Amino acid sequence: MWNKHRLAFILVGLLFHLFYLRSIFDIYFVSPLVHGMRQFKSNEEPPAKRLFLIVGDGLRADTSFDKVKHPVTGKTEFLAPYLRSLVEHNATYGISHTRMPTESRPGHVAMIAGFYEDVSAVTKGWKENPVDFDSVFNQSTHTYSFGSPDILPMFKSGASDPTKVDAWMYGHEFEDFTQSSIELDAYVFRHMDALFRNATVDSKLRHEMMQDGNVFFLHLLGCDTAGHSYRPYSAEYYDNVKYIDSQLERLVPKVREFFGDDDTAFVFTADHGMSAFGSHGDGHPNNTRTPLVAWGAGLNRPVLNDVPVYDNYTENWDLAHVRRNDVNQADIASLMSYLIGLNYPTNSVGELPLAYVNGTERTKLNALYKNALSILEQYLVKETEMIQSQLVYKEYPKFAQKSHSSYIQEIEHLIDRIANGEEDLEPEAIALSEELMKTALEGLQYLTTYNWRFIRSIVTLGFIGWITYSFTIFLRLFILEKQYAMKTSPQNLASFGALTAALNYVLYYQRSPFNYYMYLLFPLFFWSQILTNSTILHDGIREMFKGVSMLQRIGICALIVSIYEGIVYGYFDRWIFTIIFNLLALYPFFCGIKDAKTNMFWGANSMALSIFTLFDAVKIESLTQINVSGLLLVASGLYALWRVSKKINSHTKIVILLQILLLAMMLAVTNKSVTSLQQRAGLPTDAKIAGWVILTLSLSLMPLLHYLKPSNDYQVRVLVIYLTFAPTFLILTISFESFFYLLFTNYLMLWIEIESKIKAQNIAKNSQNWLQLLRISIIGFFLLQFAFFGTGNVASISSFSLDSVYRLMPVFDPFPMGALLILKIMIPYILLSTALGIMNLKLNIKDYTVSSLILSTSDVLSLNFFYLLRTEGSWLDIGVTISNYCLAILSSLFMIVLELFSHFLLKNVRDNGMDIAASKQQKRH
């Protein structure tokens, strides 16, 4: 029953969790991006007139230079002989080290804008989403870009003058994972050739193309597409690399012929690599190491090593005699700016890689100094903003010891002395410029985190206040019988009023955003209410733990905290869930269940489920596992139908048989799709259509047919729900997930029966045991986490395999593909929702008791993850901590959603002749 107290409680909880969900992005992940900086030109006498940037999307560094055995021809060869010849004779080469996430948008932003998008960019997509900061394209005279519609628009739309960036893009339908990826790259080279041809008959176009400072950007998506579809060790991936190399060999002389000079600079690199599983996104070296080969005007020729340099990673490259010059990905933007004399992008944090520059030491020094001034300017603008918004400002300690003006004076003094002939001072000036850049970047981070301590303290008090306040409300609504009329004392009002005014003034002076005021409002409200309702808290705890000694209370609390902390660690190491499951295998015995058969089945199921969190979260497609699990799903459906056949009418029996038939048909369709895709024959049209038809029928028509003549038995309803989602789960299975689906459903049914037996024992003893409610809530919350982590983790989603998705959607489209992934993730939650609803029915638990108790305790997880958030390290690690926090803070709210959804799923369901409506009348009010 909903009353005003419950509604107020839910509303406050909803607002609190939504605002505090946002808090991490306002605290930890505020963008260091600043605007209004002066611009610094990299080079007054640029060595190149134009620049070609060629990006092999998804190209690994080792594949570019390794001698590999072709899986089809059996021939051992270098895949890119032309690039190798450049490395050995004409170019400077190295590895470009990317940051995480190793995705297309952040990779291109880093190399073209010189800026690593802050972690708040994880909330952004990449399609049609313009970059909101300066870039090499923005500074260029004109940019001609060719390639993917996922990359080109964000730089064209984000340019200060979109007309200066031209884009030739293929349609999204070209990105078909089952077709030849070479066609994507062929489109780029064809249109580059067409541009040259058109310029021979269009004088205006030719004039524009002949201008100094132009950039030609060739985005080659083929390797990424082939890697996703067939893995980076496939013939398709290797052939795509060979195709790119052959086209580069044709392109370079065409460029020389068209422009009639050798004043073109070429930069070849990649945005990210590719894992052995055909995915990217995380911090694995195969994803973060990309090739960088730069040749042409203004660029050094190769430097030979006096002594060959060998290491395990490059031993098959046969390039030990050539010096390798590694860079950070953002450094490429500074290099490109220097080559054609552009202003450094105003938000760039890249450092000019001097090893690539062919110029005098004085030229290099001046360019590097301007690079340092460009980065320092970002710090100075940010510092000015900070000084104007702080009651007391403390300067960055390193600049307090040695001011930025002192750095500038020293460097300029050294430059003057070098100009007067003291060239031996050049290394010192370069080192000082690099030190200034490093200190300015550290100072920028210091300013970004300046107010952390204050606002984190507020959020911490908010979480602790919510846990205490919500538990008090739970006790009042569900445990205590009598009504309390509590009023806030004048002293309470006065003290909290004064504190509110003082803290809000601090926020106002700091020009804090609106959200900060809300972060402050919640702890002030919670702690005021806690002091007012302290009597309820005291009486409620005494009632809930009636008959339980103080030592036992401490033990129960310690156990609950241990389980929650175990769940926290399980977010990072899934094997913790294995331990918890094996401990849960013993709980029926300790709760007094003497039935050996029940204990044996429960223990066996617990241990079987515990194995899943030991499997690798990143799965490899296995048709054998899909077939075995699919047959078990069909067999389990037939067995369950036999068990309930005496309870159901002929209509229900026919519909269930149809559901089982659809499941068997989906298994056949999945087999055909997987086999065809593995044989590189594409996705058969009939299999694609059949997959969508079966999925639609199982999720829509079958439930409607049941609704015409519904069975109200809870076991039948569970079977119907189980078979409704089984075909969808099966076609989206990569390997072992359908085993999980079967065992998880069985586990939930066993849990219901065990708790029903424990309830019967309590009734026989004529005792009201609130500890059963506490136990159900804790186990239910654990299963809520396991429903997600049983088949994967956050990292496996961030770089999820497309194997299952392109059985239904062979053409790349991230949003529908993401929707299918979310549907697969949600299905175990629907099963859990059903189980909790039946538990409420069988145990006569008042509606929303379980979810309210979880809501009041589960933010122990949220508080943990708030302090476990990372802002440094790999983007995978950072992204995982963000996702963990979001999962934790939303999971308690999700329990309410599950309980609400269970009312819909279990409408009119009966247990032993008693329907929900009748059951509710017997519940305590």
Curated annotation (Swiss-Prot):
Enzyme superclass (EC): transferase
Alphabetized InterPro entries for the sequence: Alkaline_phosphatase_core_sf (IPR017850), GPI_EtnP_transferase_1 (IPR007070), GPI_EtnP_transferase_1_C (IPR017852), PIGN_N (IPR037671), Sulfatase_N (IPR000917)
Keyword Secreted assigned: no
EC number: 2.-.-.-
Superkingdom to which the source organism belongs: Eukaryota
Record's GO cellular component terms: endoplasmic reticulum membrane; fungal-type cell wall; fungal-type vacuole
Its biological purpose: Ethanolamine phosphate transferase involved in glycosylphosphatidylinositol-anchor biosynthesis. Transfers ethanolamine phosphate to the first alpha-1,4-linked mannose of the glycosylphosphatidylinositol precursor of GPI-anchor.
Keywords (A to Z) from UniProt: Cell wall biogenesis/degradation, Endoplasmic reticulum, Glycoprotein, GPI-anchor biosynthesis, Membrane, Transferase, Transmembrane, Transmembrane helix
GO term, biological process aspect, one: cell wall organization
Cellular compartment(s): Endoplasmic reticulum membrane
Transmembrane segments: 7-27, 458-478, 493-510, 517-537, 548-568, 575-595, 600-620, 622-642, 654-674, 688-708, 720-740, 776-796, 819-839, 849-869, 886-906
Protein name: GPI ethanolamine phosphate transferase 1
Cited Gene3D superfamilies: Alkaline Phosphatase, subunit A (3.40.720.10)
Source organism of this protein record: Eremothecium gossypii (strain ATCC 10895 / CBS 109.51 / FGSC 9923 / NRRL Y-1056)
Pathway: Glycolipid biosynthesis; glycosylphosphatidylinositol-anchor biosynthesis
Family classification: Belongs to the PIGG/PIGN/PIGO family. PIGN subfamily.
Lineage: Eukaryota, Fungi, Dikarya, Ascomycota, Saccharomycotina
Spans within the Cytoplasmic topological domain: 1-6, 479-492, 538-547, 596-599, 643-653, 709-719, 797-818, 870-885
Pfam families with a match to the protein in the record: PigN (PF04987), Sulfatase (PF00884)
GO molecular function terms attached to this record: mannose-ethanolamine phosphotransferase activity
UniProt entry tagged with the keyword Cell wall biogenesis/degradation: yes
